[in-house]
C-alpha cells in the first residue's frame, strides 16, 4: 500500500490458506483505488501482501451461506484467491466497485492514448 492513498474501506477479511488443510486466516485489509492490501496483524506492523488492481481480472463466485459471503479474486495469471466476510460488511461489493472503477479508468486512458490527446469523446446525451 502506497503512503497517502485514500482508504475506501478498512477492516477484517478471512483468506483461505493455500496449504493442504486450507484454514481460514483473518487478515486486516485496506482497500484503496489502486489495490487491496492484506496485513497478517491488526497493527499493520508486518509486511503486507498487496493485490494491485492491474493484476486482478475479476471478483468471482459470490455465494452467501449463513452469516458469510464467500468470493474469489481471480488474477490476470488465473490464480484464484478465496475470501469470506461477514454478510453485513459487504467487502465483496466494495472490492468489485473499486476494481470496476480502476478498469474503466484504464480503458479510457488506453482509448485516449490510441486516439491521440487532441481527440475528445462527446458525452452521452
From Swiss-Prot:
Membrane topology summary? Peripheral membrane protein
Disulfide bridge map: none
One GO biological process term is:
positive regulation of apoptotic process
Q: Does the UniProt entry include the keyword Cytoplasm? A: yes
Report the CDD domains cross-referenced here: PH
Please report the stretch or stretches of sequence annotated as the PH domain.
7-100
Q: Which Pfam families match?
A: PH
What InterPro entries does UniProt report for this protein, alphabetically? PH-like_dom_sf (IPR011993), PH_domain (IPR001849), PHLA1/2/3 (IPR042832)
Task: Fill in the domain comment.
Answer: The PH domain binds phosphoinositides with a broad specificity. It may compete with the PH domain of some other proteins, thereby interfering with their binding to phosphatidylinositol 4,5-bisphosphate (PIP2) and phosphatidylinositol 3,4,5-trisphosphate (PIP3).
Protein name as it appears in the record: Pleckstrin homology-like domain family A member 2
Q: What organism is the protein native to?
A: Xenopus laevis (African clawed frog)
Amino acid at each position: 500500500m502506497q503512503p497517502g492513498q485514500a482508504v475506501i474501506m478498512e477492516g477484517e477479511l478471512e483468506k483461505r490458506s493455500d496449504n493442504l488443510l486450507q484454514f481460514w486466516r483473518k487478515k486486516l485489509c485496506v482497500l484503496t483505488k489502486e489495490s487491496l492490501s492484506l496485513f497478517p496483524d491488526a497493527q499493520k506492523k508486518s509486511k503486507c501482501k498487496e493485490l494491485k488492481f492491474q493484476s486482478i481480472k475479476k471478483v468471482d463466485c459470490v455465494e452467501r451461506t449463513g452469516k458469510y459471503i464467500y468470493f474469489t479474486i481471480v488474477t490476470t495469471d488465473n490464480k484464484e484467491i478465496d475470501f469470506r466476510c461477514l454478510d453485513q460488511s459487504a467487502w465483496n461489493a466494495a472490492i468489485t466497485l473499486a476494481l470496476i472503477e480502476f478498469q474503466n479508468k484504464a480503458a479510457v486512458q488506453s482509448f485516449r492514448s490510441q486516439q491521440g490527446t487532441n481527440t475528445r469523446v462527446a458525452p452521452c446525451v
